[in-house]
Structure formats: C-alpha cells, structure tokens
Amino acid sequence: MAKELIYSGKAKDILTTEDENVIIAQYKDQATALNGVKKEQIAGKGQLNNQISSLIFQKLNAAGVATHFIKKISETEQLNKKVKIIPLEVVLRNVTAGSFSKRFGVKEGIQLEKPIVEFYYKNDDLDDPFINDEHVKFLKLANDEDIAYIKAETRRINKLLSDWFHQIGLKLIDFKLEFGFDKDGKIILADEFSPDNCRLWDAQGHHMDKDVFRRGLGELTDVYEVVWEKLQELK
C-alpha cells in the first residue's frame, strides 16, 4: 500500500493509498487544546482514539449514516473514503458547557430544551470563528440544501450517539462533526468521533473526555480507556 503524506494535522496524519479515492488516517499520540496552544505527547492516545472512532463509525454505518469510514487496518490506522472536507466545524450541544457557557454567561450543566446546532468556520488563522447560516453561504462553504442536510444529519447522529452513550452510563454533552463531499458529490460524515471531539460526563458529573487534558483534571488515557471499555459493552 503506497503511503505518501497528504496532510499532517493536530491529531492525525492523512496518507495516500494505491486507490486515489481511499486514504489512510493515522492517529497520533499528540494531545492539543486551546487551538494548539496547549500541546503534549501522550503514549497510547492515538490507539485509543482509533479504536473508539472505528467502533462508533462502524455503528453509524450500520445505522444507515453515510460516512467515510471503511475499516480499521492497524492499532493506529484506518481506511477512509477520500472526501473534499467542507471547512465547517458542526457543533451540537445537548447541555451547556465550555465555550457556550462562556459566550452566553450561563453555568455549565443546563439541559437544553432542544439540542442546538452551531457552525464554526474551520480556519486556524482566524481561530475557527462562530458563524451562522448566512456566513456559510457568503463564504460559499455550502448552499441552503447542504446546510439543511448537515443540520438534519447532525441531529439524527445525535439521537443515535446519545442513546448508545446512555446505555453505558455516559451523558453526551456536546460534540463536533465534520462533513465532506465524496467522489460522487454526496455529503458524508468524515473526520473522527472520539473523546477528543465530544464531551462526555458520567453519572457523577466527571469529565470523560479531552476536558481532562484541557483543564488539567487527570490522566487523559486513563479516562479514554474507561470510555473504550464501556463502548465494548454496547449490543
């Protein structure tokens, strides 16, 4: 399998394969927070994120969600369909936390009556600014039809994920998704789903996600290992 580096990100490297429509995502042991300001190498993180994301994407595929995931090929690598990423971070919030609480001056932990979908312009130089539908169209990131589909699909994914995490005693607080266009021009779910890009709280309100690293609350891999062990209990 020919492996040439296409892109090196904070959490993953993207490599070519012999098929121009398939790439390898190689998960790193690097942890970052605050848009890369806080950075640390944490042994075992890449393997855990690859395991967790592979399992979640397998379940999403089985539930009828169109994703880029093909299969896990090693402890830290997976095969994905190549997509043209839409430079949007799509955030869904079930409970107030993090930047939402800071932005609106509300305490963390308030259950929202209806999940809120937010868009952020994926641009490191601009610190990924919070934008609305009109900005998305002005920047020509997506049209009305694309926006409606992305929002509806994000809400559908939220229902699936919230149920799965509830089954293993975890509450899905919020999460970030990325979408892209496949070779046929269809929008599909891309990137990853792991404790790196979601918030999970246990029954006691303990953080079971990257906030452990972001806020200096403990060992990241210890928490991710617990999430991985719990996920394997899913039917």
Curated annotation (Swiss-Prot):
GO biological process assignments: 'de novo' IMP biosynthetic process; cobalamin biosynthetic process
UniProtKB keywords: ATP-binding, Ligase, Nucleotide-binding, Purine biosynthesis
Gene3D superfamilies, sorted: ATP-grasp fold, B domain, Phosphorylase Kinase, domain 1
Pfam families: SAICAR_synt (PF01259)
Superkingdom assignment: Bacteria
EC number(s) stated in the UniProt entry for this protein: 6.3.2.6
Catalytic activity: 5-amino-1-(5-phospho-D-ribosyl)imidazole-4-carboxylate + L-aspartate + ATP = (2S)-2-[5-amino-1-(5-phospho-beta-D-ribosyl)imidazole-4-carboxamido]succinate + ADP + phosphate + 2 H(+)
Gene Ontology MF terms: ATP binding; phosphoribosylaminoimidazolesuccinocarboxamide synthase activity
Entry annotated with the keyword Nucleotide-binding: yes
InterPro entries according to UniProt: SAICAR_synt/ADE2_N (IPR028923), SAICAR_synt_PurC (IPR033934), SAICAR_synth (IPR001636), SAICAR_synthetase (IPR050089), SAICAR_synthetase_CS (IPR018236)
Pathway where this protein functions: Purine metabolism; IMP biosynthesis via de novo pathway; 5-amino-1-(5-phospho-D-ribosyl)imidazole-4-carboxamide from 5-amino-1-(5-phospho-D-ribosyl)imidazole-4-carboxylate: step 1/2
PANTHER family referenced in this protein's UniProt entry, alphabetically: MULTIFUNCTIONAL PROTEIN ADE2 (PTHR43599), SI:DKEY-6E2.2 (PTHR43599:SF3)
Family under the similarity heading: Belongs to the SAICAR synthetase family.
Protein name listed in UniProt: Phosphoribosylaminoimidazole-succinocarboxamide synthase
Protein's organism: Streptococcus mutans serotype c (strain ATCC 700610 / UA159)
UniProt gene name: purC
